[in-house]
Amino acid sequence: MTGPTIQCHQLPFQERLRLSDLLGHPKPFFSLLELQACDADQHGSAIAQLRQGSVTGIIVRNVYDSVLMRRIVERLEQHDPPFLKTWFPEKFKSWFYGQNLNLMQTDPETYFQQAEVFHQHMTELFPAGQGIDSCVMKLLSRLDDNRPYRAAPGPDPGQSYMLTTFRGHGEGGYITAHCDNEQSLRPAYEHLQTLVSSHMYSMVLLIGKPEGGGALEVFDYRVEPENARLLNDDSVTSKPDLTQLSSVAFSLNAGDLIIVDSGRYLHRVTPVAGQTTRWTACSFMAHAKDRNAVYCWG
């Protein structure tokens, strides 16, 4: 991990939030903690604060250096290693390397076979000891009182969910506004629901930055886990009008990581501008029900 050391004291929101991190004006609903990856051990309760609601998002700078990220982008562009490629709905102009559980269109047995191959390819993508599992998950653990972060186990011994997915967003690619907790209502989550708490959050590692757009935008609209169905149920007509909501949008550099209370807060990815693909790794996560670990999936 690289990058100069900075002090990351808990300050009043207006002091803690830097305009370089946000597109638009600071909004008081969003409490942001920013730190350098090398300072993670100074913030061992950061993710606990996020789960409790006193922090809404955490930006970790320089998890990877830009040179390595460019190499990873080159390999992803060449589809090397040959990850399973799946797609968002066509209008989103985006795709996955790996299988997004929310959009899973295969049977569980096939999914867990694909997950085994996916993890092999993921190991090949990064230099030894610098992969998502060995670097990012350990970083998250350091920000969560050293609680282990790992791929959620499958229903049978030796099975596990895909730890993450790599996402490519082409020109015009975007993701509509949603809260992640609503995903748990879908059939693919039936087994996972038996393992984890109802409140999930997520991390996004920016691997390749687009020419413009592709920002993660979070809205001043919060839905508790027990009310997630309100956004997932098409029969509910009183859904939020985004034009009436305050929001913040984050500008990250390649190698930066953001952790967001995406389970409760409405959020989206704004359309990508230009021909440079936006590449990320994205994992969802939630407390194991015994609270001794955090389980992750893509």
Label for each model-derived stretch:
Residues 171-249:
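Catalytic core of non-heme Fe(II) oxygenases with the double-stranded beta-helix
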Residues 46, 190-193, 268-270:
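Generic recognition of flexible, low-complexity loop/linker segments
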Residues 1-130:
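N-terminal auxiliary "cap/dimerization" subdomain that precedes the catalytic jelly-roll/cupin core
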Residues 105-171, 188, 195:
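Signature of the catalytic double-stranded beta-helix
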Residues 228-298:
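Catalytic core of Fe(II)/2-oxoglutarate
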Residues 55-57, 161-163, 198-204, 213, ...:
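Extracellular structured ligand-interaction cores
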Residues 58-62, 152, 163-165, 215-218, ...:
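A structural signal for short, well-ordered beta-strand segments and their strand-loop junctions
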Residues 62-64, 167-170, 181, 205-207, ...:
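Short, flexible loop/turn elements at secondary-structure junctions
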